[in-house]
Amino acid sequence: MELLYIDPGTGSMLFSVLIGATATLYFLARAVVLKLKFILGGKKGAADKSAHTYVIYNEDKRYQNVFRPVLDAFERHGTEVSYFTSFKDDEAFSAGYKFVKSEYIGEGNAAFARLNLLSADIVLATTPGLGVYQWKRSKNVKHYAHILHSPGDATMYRLFGIDYFDSVLLSGEYQKDDVRYLEKTRGIKEKDLPVVGCTYLDFYKERIEKIPAEEKHEFTVLLSPSWGPSGILAKYGERLLDPLLATGWNIIVRPHPQSKISEAEMLERLSKKYEGNGNLIWDYETDNIYSMKKADIMISDFSGIIYDYTFLCDKPVMYVNADIELALYDAYDVPGQKPWQVNAVKDFGIELKEEQFPTIKEVIQNASDSEELARRRAKAKQTAWQFEGQSGEKVYEFMAEKERQLNFTGSSEQ
């Protein structure tokens, strides 16, 4: 008996068809029930008990800290919010919340099946691709809001990543223009684009300040590559690690989380080669703040951790090969300019060239910090991380005001 093979694209399409059919039957049945309540009760049926006012969805353990300041704000205001998560050990379960109703809804297709049948006024998520892949708009959700999980450009998502949201919550005013350009050229409706700050940076700022200083500090270099063939670890490997370890300094390598999935063979090879080297630490922890706190300087490429380190630690950064291939990203459709985040790194960072690797100790020693570099870091921070320390409250205020607008409009139409 031959086994049938369904390629991933066809499988995704079939899943979408199945979800669409299920959703249709669900909404038809629900409509019939409400209609019967109306007829038999002589008035409008009671509100659907499964409906939610506010829903927040977290797709992965990496993003739970994006939502913690928002959940804390809902708790402070005594406003109930449904928090759906695809991370079984989400910290929200043990946070002692009274007004945050946390629920694990599974991962992947199981989570999307739940989300696609949702009834809610407002859904907030950091997951892109609404209306593009498995995640479809529910007819019973009034407003979809996307919150950025980086202070970088809003166009640095894969194609159409944020096109079909009703609002995108930004970390800085600078992100608006490119979003508006794509809306106009693609003929899609304008979204609400409130600037709310950066929630996870606010969260980490509090935590990193509480980490005690080392009793005996040794000079430490943090190597933080992005993933993919252009990332510095994949591209240079031993050519960069060998001279770094020859310095005798402590070297922390923090691979991108995706590298463990897409570049596992490379990581295993390098780990085995340098096994037993006491100066080399491989950091796979969820939180990056402990390595950043220890580091005196960071070496990276185009990874978003550059901004975490720059904005939270205010220490010098060296970049190698900071350019990124934009063809798969929304930013590719914005002509005439590179994304702000690419130019910003080159402005406040120090370039490290491949031919400098053999003398990297001297290069780093001579790449001292300066008042000018500190000024440029501060400028980038002010641009990309507005409302520092206020983001959770800002997101709550936006959602509460949007819910009032939706209900006012709905009641006016009845």
Q: Each PLM stretch: what is its role?
A:
Residues 267-284:
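Nucleotide-activated donor-binding/catalytic signature segment of Leloir-type glycosyltransferases, i.e.
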Residues 101-108, 280-284, 347-357:
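Short acidic-hydrophobic, aromatic-tinged amphipathic segments that line or gate anion-handling sites
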Residues 62-78, 199-270, 354-357, 368, ...:
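Conserved catalytic-core segment of nucleotide-activated headgroup transferases in glycan assembly
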Residues 55-205:
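Active-site and donor-binding regions of nucleotide-sugar-utilizing enzymes
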Residues 142, 146, 285-332:
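A donor-sugar binding/catalytic signature common to diverse glycosyltransferases
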Residues 311-366:
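Nucleotide-sugar donor-binding patch of glycosyltransferase catalytic domains
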Residues 1-9:
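Short, strongly hydrophobic alpha-helical membrane anchors
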Residues 42, 346, 352-414:
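C-terminal amphipathic helix plus adjacent low-complexity
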